[in-house]
């Protein structure tokens, strides 16, 4: 479970970085009406790159915890802590989809749900 969650987190972060720097207008167009100015792109890149690096950092953190080979009870606590983190991210994503007319694209939402479910599964089964 550790490497799968790690890969999901890193994949989402790298995808966000690629999207915001290779095609910022294409990434932002669904959320803005009218022309997207260079100032708006610059402002958004400054926020999105921090968010993306946070995702990558969490992925690397989870990967390093996997490599430390904790006992199953410790793994259970790690997965529970990750589930709380991922659940918070999921709540924000769902709120944005339902009430704000935005949120992550559906494939990313599926990855967030998958990572949260894997964390919950790991917290119950206490496996690595």
What residue ranges belong to the model's regions?
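Hydrophobic transmembrane helix segments
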Residues: 8-53
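Hydrophobic alpha-helical transmembrane segments of polytopic
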Residues: 2-8, 51, 78-86, 108-111
């Amino acid at each position: 479970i550790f490497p799968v969650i790690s890969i999901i987190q890193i994949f989402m972060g790298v995808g966000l970085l690629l999207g915001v720097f290779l095609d910022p207008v294409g990434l932002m167009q669904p959320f803005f009406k009218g022309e997207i100015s260079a100032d708006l792109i610059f402002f958004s890149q400054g926020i999105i790159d921090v968010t993306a690096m946070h995702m990558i950092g969490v992925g690397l953190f989870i990967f390093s915890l996997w490599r430390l080979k904790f006992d199953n009870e410790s793994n259970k606590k790690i997965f529970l802590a990750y589930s709380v983190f991922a659940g918070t991210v999921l709540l924000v994503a769902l709120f944005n989809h339902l009430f704000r007319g935005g949120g992550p694209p559906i494939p990313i939402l599926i990855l967030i749900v998958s990572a949260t479910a894997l964390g919950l599964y790991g917290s119950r089964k206490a496996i690595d």
